């Protein structure tokens, strides 16, 4: 079993830096597109055998050191009572805007409401046995609430910000409910066999550090503290958090996910030796010639300066039009250049 990823999460020394990619099971792989051509995105998420198949593809094709469950962060939100569709981005036809809307939301039972997610994890633990660890994941409460209130993607998330400022009681009630749902969902993933959990707060960085601390931090902290994580490391990734790492760090967790807007060495200095880090190559680097990819991999590794507790990753998801051979070259570079 390749335990480099889990060892790095706990800050233990490893013989070479582990690497995986956010969205590594995805559209840039022809093998993924072959599966996806037979079903809709939601059908793929809700069919355990297919979700497991595409989860394993990048492990075999790229040689990454961890698999991450193929799913969507909004999967557990639908059974709360919202109608979800992808056209092509996520859209809720009945967004949450009032206290009455919040009161109608239910806390799903993961075993009953999203059994396909847990079944995919169980299949994957069998199929990945002796290979690499499996990462489960979920959206952070704030990012989930962004979609639930806005009803779709947004550039500025003005609707949820307006709720935060103008209807703080509605916002607090919603965040409380989403946090409880998230806790149940992620603990169910751990019970099913997920060996690490990544919490994605894709939109946490749209807030000022002051607003993040007031409106987001209490809920993410509650979520992380509520996970049964004695042997299950938690990676906390807040996109755009480079300017507020000391605040984000207060939420807890074992690994801080970093995007590419901060020097990895500077981030480690801010976070201190107790917290591992994950990141942080700019995803567009994978369009570059191999010599440039190698140079950039070397730069990120040099910024870490050999400190234990580094998982190499992109600073966000791999882009759909990246040549797969460039992703494979990057993984090989990380392994070759970090060999101890």
Curated annotation (Swiss-Prot):
Q: Does the keyword Nucleotide-binding apply?
A: no
* Top enzyme category: lyase
One GO location term (cellular component): cytosol
Q: Which reaction does it catalyse?
A: uroporphyrinogen III + 4 H(+) = coproporphyrinogen III + 4 CO2
- One biological process term in Gene Ontology: protoporphyrinogen IX biosynthetic process from glutamate
Its annotated compartments are:
Cytoplasm
GO molecular function terms attached to this record: uroporphyrinogen decarboxylase activity
Tell me yes or no: is Cytoplasm among this UniProt entry's keywords: yes
Tell me which residues bind substrate: 23-27, 72, 147, 202, 316
The record's section on Pfam families has: URO-D
Extract the InterPro entries matched here: UROD/MetE-like_sf, Uroporphyrinogen_deCO2ase_HemE, Uroporphyrinogen_deCOase
Q: What is its EC number?
A: 4.1.1.37
Query: Which keywords accompany this UniProt record?
Result: Cytoplasm, Decarboxylase, Lyase, Porphyrin biosynthesis
Pathway field = Porphyrin-containing compound metabolism; protoporphyrin-IX biosynthesis; coproporphyrinogen-III from 5-aminolevulinate: step 4/4
Instruction: Point out the annotated site residues (description: Transition state stabilizer).
Output: 72
* HAMAP family found in the cross-reference section: URO_D
Role: Catalyzes the decarboxylation of four acetate groups of uroporphyrinogen-III to yield coproporphyrinogen-III.
**Complex and partners:** Homodimer.
Spell out the family assignment given in the record's similarity comment: Belongs to the uroporphyrinogen decarboxylase family.
Q: Which NCBIfam families match?
A: hemE
Protein name (Swiss-Prot/TrEMBL): Uroporphyrinogen decarboxylase
Instruction: Name the species this protein comes from.
Output: Trichlorobacter lovleyi (strain ATCC BAA-1151 / DSM 17278 / SZ) (Geobacter lovleyi)
